[in-house]
Amino acid sequence: MVIKMSLTNKVPEKDVHDLFTRVAPHYDQMNNLISLGTQNGWRKKFFKKLKVKAGDFALDLCCGTGDLTIALAKQVGPSGNVIGLDFNQKMLDLADKKIRGQNLQKEIQLKQGDAMHLPYTDQSFDIVTIGFGLRNVPDADQVLKEIYRVLKPDGKVGILETSQPTNPIIKLGWESYFKLFPNFAKLLGANVDDYKYLSHTTAKFISATRLKEMLEQDGFKNVIITKLNLGAGAIHIGIKKKMR
């Protein structure tokens, strides 16, 4: 069965860009709320599953304020290199401040760009990651195809994203939580409507199983899923196998 996920996010791309410019100062707090305060633990599990090697050349898509990018740079070490790509300059400015604060300017390069149309040649990277970004792009399938294109043979993709719990009781609690989520905007001094959008894309994103099927459809092999917080989040790891 073909899993089509074009127009994942039907909000016009310019509107999404403007929204992230507005929420940038509160983005880290927002991610903490979305992950129920466990995003740091999620990242640790993510890298444990991804098994990055020292010296890898890595690309972090939708890098936002740079937390995953910085963690990735520490994994590849000084012999490796990381590019963090995001479509929003305000987010990149915040990422740059963090990177300079940790003296990682040599290891990390930031780039403003479109995850659906990557400005890189085929088979460029050992690792491509995307954290909390796939649900916000207009066409997630196109992003997965681009990831596959720029990965080297035997390269790995790692996706850290919110998901949908399958247990009915947990699912009900998850949905109830996100109905309250926009109210947190007031505590952060942010726009309530922006947080309604963020809660909607989080609550309505596809299941971990469907995302696995999409990855396999686009050519990735040995795709594994690790569920987080009883299914509220998920890690997907896949490999671009060498042609035999």
Swiss-Prot record:
S-adenosyl-L-methionine binds at T65, D86, D114, A115. GO terms for biological process: menaquinone biosynthetic process; methylation. It catalyses: a 2-demethylmenaquinol + S-adenosyl-L-methionine = a menaquinol + S-adenosyl-L-homocysteine + H(+). GO terms for molecular function: demethylmenaquinone methyltransferase activity. It holds the Pfam family Ubie_methyltran. Pathway: Quinol/quinone metabolism; menaquinone biosynthesis; menaquinol from 1,4-dihydroxy-2-naphthoate: step 2/2. The keyword Methyltransferase applies. Its EC number is 2.1.1.163. It comes from the Bacteria. It is an enzyme of class 2 (transferase). Keywords: Menaquinone biosynthesis, Methyltransferase, S-adenosyl-L-methionine, Transferase. Belongs to the class I-like SAM-binding methyltransferase superfamily. MenG/UbiE family. PANTHER family: 2-METHOXY-6-POLYPRENYL-1,4-BENZOQUINOL METHYLASE, MITOCHONDRIAL, METHYLTRANSFERASE. NCBIfam families: MenG_MenH_UbiE, PRK00216.1-4, PRK00216.1-5. Methyltransferase required for the conversion of demethylmenaquinol (DMKH2) to menaquinol (MKH2). This is Demethylmenaquinone methyltransferase. It comes from Lactobacillus johnsonii (strain CNCM I-12250 / La1 / NCC 533).
